[in-house]
Curated annotation (Swiss-Prot):
Record's protein name: Probable tRNA sulfurtransferase
Keyword annotations from UniProtKB, A to Z: ATP-binding, Cytoplasm, Nucleotide-binding, RNA-binding, Thiamine biosynthesis, Transferase, tRNA-binding
Binding positions for ATP per the UniProt entry: 183-184, 208-209, 265, 287, 296
CDD domains, per the entry: PPase_ThiI (cd01712), THUMP_ThiI (cd11716)
One GO cellular component, as annotated: cytosol
Gene3D superfamilies on file: 3.30.2130.30, HUPs (3.40.50.620)
Organism: Streptococcus gordonii (strain Challis / ATCC 35105 / BCRC 15272 / CH1 / DL1 / V288)
Localization in the cell: Cytoplasm
Gene from which the chain derives: thiI
Domain THUMP: 60-165
Ranges annotated as spanning the membrane: none
Catalysed reaction, written as an equation: [ThiI sulfur-carrier protein]-S-sulfanyl-L-cysteine + a uridine in tRNA + 2 reduced [2Fe-2S]-[ferredoxin] + ATP + H(+) = [ThiI sulfur-carrier protein]-L-cysteine + a 4-thiouridine in tRNA + 2 oxidized [2Fe-2S]-[ferredoxin] + AMP + diphosphate; [ThiS sulfur-carrier protein]-C-terminal Gly-Gly-AMP + S-sulfanyl-L-cysteinyl-[cysteine desulfurase] + AH2 = [ThiS sulfur-carrier protein]-C-terminal-Gly-aminoethanethioate + L-cysteinyl-[cysteine desulfurase] + A + AMP + 2 H(+)
Pathway recorded for this protein: Cofactor biosynthesis; thiamine diphosphate biosynthesis
Family of this protein: Belongs to the ThiI family.
This enzyme's EC code(s): 2.8.1.4
Length: 404
């Protein structure tokens, strides 16, 4: 027997009242986006659950993808069976013989949406339970927390049987909590921040600052690969590459070394905010962790934040580095993040950066620069690429080779 569908149950969506169907429909679209690499798979969303029809597609890779999608509480692979008592008896006996081990307990739970079926739920439980006893005489029934719970659903088109319940990622469907711009450096922290924002339903676009020739094509590919890792949690992500060379050279030439990092981050924040406004997002997200580096003291955050009134979400701000690394390993971004490519935040990093910069000093040094002109030129020069769950990596590799 082969699985024919997967039944998906919702998590926090049960608390969403009148907005429930909006959340469910968004989850459906996210599932369709992530599973788009399986053309035979069909997704149908109902108020109480979503049905994923496999149509011959291998169950295992689909299940691995579903485990990552936010908004799913759990799911169960199911067998499609002819809607008749003899067919159900045969299927239940076959399944139990496959999964039963000595000493296990079981329970039958039946549900009918087709009330014209010849047996009601209670009668079906009894009939199928008797069939299990015939196949495995020594098996014991247990109504609470059995080792094996066979779930039987009688629908209009067929009957479905399942016995596994696999835990999902929980959280909220991506896109149900607004939209944010993720400042993605290529390090360990910012992809984790993006993941945690996705978990709470925030639709993200990744903003990456590139300063060629100081930053390499490898650094750009690294950031795109990190973005691709995040797509498995909610579908395609827009990757926004910002040209940053001119700005960094101007800062390096005209500002004191101690304030290089502060001014660099202030420009990044301004540019991200301008892109946010143009693309209809509500928040900025970054991977700052309090006290981890010189630019992540409270004083530095205050000086950098002063250039925007937009809310800045810092999902990892109170985490230790080891806590962040643990999540990075879980979401499979860690090995990419530690690849030895320099990013914009490291190429001109001063030996003794200011840990308690003053806003008035930052503004004084910025007066030496054409701030608005530099920001406008950077925003005008952005390049946007849609990153998919399994992008055509050959095309990306060809692009990198061309740049090299």
């Amino acid at each position: 027997m082969h699985y024919s569908e997967i039944m998906v149950r919702y998590g926090e969506l049960s608390t969403k009242g009148k907005n429930r169907m909006r959340f469910i429909n968004k989850l459906k679209r996210n599932i369709q986006s992530v599973l788009s690499i399986y053309p035979q798979v069909h997704v149908k969303a109902d108020r109480d659950r979503t049905h994923i029809y496999l149509h011959g597609t291998d169950y295992q890779p689909v299940a691995e993808s579903l485990k990552q999608i936010f908004g799913i509480q759990n799911f169960s692979p199911s067998y499609r069976v002819k809607k008749s008592v003899p067919a159900l008896i045969e299927a239940v006996q076959t399944i139990m013989k496959q999964v039963y081990q000595e000493g296990m307990t079981f329970k039958i739970t039946s549900k009918r949406s087709d009330h014209s079926f010849e047996l009601d739920s209670r009668e079906l439980n009894q009939t199928l339970g008797d069939a299990v006893f015939m196949a495995i005489p020594n098996v014991q029934v247990k109504m609470k927390a059995p080792d094996i719970e066979l779930r039987v659903e009688i629908r209009e088109e067929a009957a479905y049987i399942s016995y596994e319940t696999i835990r999902g990622a929980g959280g909220l469907p991506v896109g149900t909590s607004g939209k944010g711009m993720l400042m993605l450096s290529g390090g360990i922290d910012s992809p984790v921040a993006g993941y945690l924002a996705l978990k709470r339903g925030v639709d993200i676009e990744a903003v990456h600052f590139a300063s060629p020739p100081y930053t390499s094509p490898g650094a750009l590919k690294k950031a795109q690969d990190l973005t691709r890792k995040l797509t498995k949690f909610g579908g395609n992500i827009q990757f926004i590459e910002v040209p940053f060379t001119d700005i960094q050279e101007e800062i390096k030439a005209k500002a004191p070394e101690a304030y290089l990092m502060t001014l660099t981050r202030r420009f990044m924040m301004r540019i991200t905010d301008r892109i946010r406004e143009e693309r209809g997002a509500q928040v900025i997200i970054n991977g700052e962790s309090l006290g981890q580096v010189a630019s992540q003291t409270i004083e530095s955050m205050q000086a950098i934040n002063a250039v925007t009134n937009t809310p800045v979400i810092r999902p990892v701000v109170t985490m230790d580095k080891l806590e962040i690394i643990e999540i990075a390993e879980k979401i499979d971004t860690f090995q990419i993040s530690i690849q030895p490519f320099e990013d914009c935040c490291t190429i001109f990093a001063p030996d003794r950066p200011k840990t308690n910069p003053k806003i008035k000093n930052a503004e004084q040094y910025e007066a030496r620069l054409d701030v608005e002109g530099l920001v406008e030129r950077a925003v005008a020069g952005i390049m946007i690429t849609e990153i998919r769950p399994q992008a055509e990596t050959d095309e990306v590799d060809e692009l990198i080779e061309g740049l090299l």
